[in-house]
Amino acid sequence: MDVRRILTERWDVPVIFTTQVQFLNTLFAGGNTALRRLHALEDSILIFDEIQTLPVRCTYLFNAAMNFLKDFCRVTIVLCTATQPPLAQLEFPIEMSENADLTSDTTELFEGFQRVQIENICKDGGASVDEIADEIVSSAEVHGNVLCIVNLTKQARELYAAVIEHLCESEQDIHVVHLSTKMCPAHRKEVLKSVRTELAGCGQYPEQRLICISTQLIEAGVDVSFPVVYRALAGFSSIAQAAGRCNRHGEMERGLVRLFSFENEDLSRLEDIWQGKKIALDLLYHAEADTILSPHTMEDYFRRFYRVQTARTLRYPMASQNTIFDLLSSNEAGLQQAHEHGDDPALWFTHAFRDAGSAFEVIDSYTESVLVPYAGGKEMIVEFNDKQFDKKMIGRRMRAAQQYMVSLFSYEVKRLSALGALWQTESGILSLREEYYDEAFGVQVNEQRNTCCMI
């Protein structure tokens, strides 16, 4: 019996550290595993870090769940963030206690913790990748270490390549690293470890320079501190998170955060970021960039952000015209359909729990996990491909293999499969061929030439 697994499934221990995804699945996802945890929430204290990252479509579900836990399960809820979204001011609000703020004067607190200066260098029509690369390299020459955060994986790769090309042409010795979710967790940890080591040694070796180009993943509680941070324009909450990686430990009086915009940026698949960017762009026309982290401006941003969301968007819209929020509340569509078929339900509960649970996903999971040949992942691929492998051990070994897995979208899996880059081990684990995993970028979805010649 795996005691650790049982505790993980049931939450039968005093202190639990989990993710927002796992918590929301416990409340709303179908299946029995999540339900085993629900009873453990009674008489508990729930602390949500970075609550502004709550997916927009889960907003009303989250508010209703928090109100239920507070009123019926005697739960105390603490929402932590530097950018508090106005969840208590929506049509279906979260019910805050009186004097809910744990800090008495947020304006005074903001002024006391103002560690960065924000500059808006966006230009009409946006800048090219080469222009941003030149800007970053020039900044590294003057200020030292530079972090650049972009919205898209493609942008991170292109910008990394442009910076490398610029440095090669100018024969400058600056270390450049890349971070994105196309790298497995073990790979990202190794890169972050080297980044922290270089940042820690900058006092001893001030002539050294580091440029880190990353997607938003570095904003998720990663403890790094750069004197200069460039952020591709997005919502103010994202900008605030980026600013949290600048002068984080107060090494200087004020660090520098510069906002820029790419030309022809396609955010059509990232609705929340696209909406946030539009509102941020509008506000930047009417406010000084250096004031956007103030409580007043942040409140204005969130008010506009939720104003443009439709009521349906906040209720978790489904492929049909229904929403999960409606299925779990009045379920009027279900009742109407029952009436039309002469099947009036005799139950007091008319909620469509099964349909709601089947449809609920915190993050669109149109992805497939692939085991990649990075470090220990190579040995795991060999292990899973061994015909003598004990299939009873697959659950335990797969948990260990998570450090070497990359989630790929369906179109990426299709493209890699067409290139012959993916194959299944004897244990049925989808694996990536070695030439399609790059030490700088991670998974390569374009055709790669094999460096080995078979004669």
Label each PLM-derived region with a short phrase.
Residues A82-A140:
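Interdomain hinge/linker at the junction between the two RecA-like core domains of SF2 helicases
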Residues Q20, D49-I51:
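Walker B catalytic acidic pair
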Residues T26, P206-E207, I211-S225, Q241-H249:
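SF2 helicase motor core recognition
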Residues M1-F28:
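Inter-Walker segment of RecA-like/P-loop motor cores
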Residues K70, A133-H143, L147-I149, K154-K189, ...:
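C-terminal helicase lobe and adjacent C-terminal extensions/tails of nucleic-acid helicase motors
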Residues A34-I45, Q52-E108:
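Post-DEXD/H (motif II) to motif III coupling segment of the RecA-like Helicase ATP-binding lobe
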Residues D12-V15, V21, E42-I45, F72-V78, ...:
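Loop/turn-to-beta-strand initiation segments
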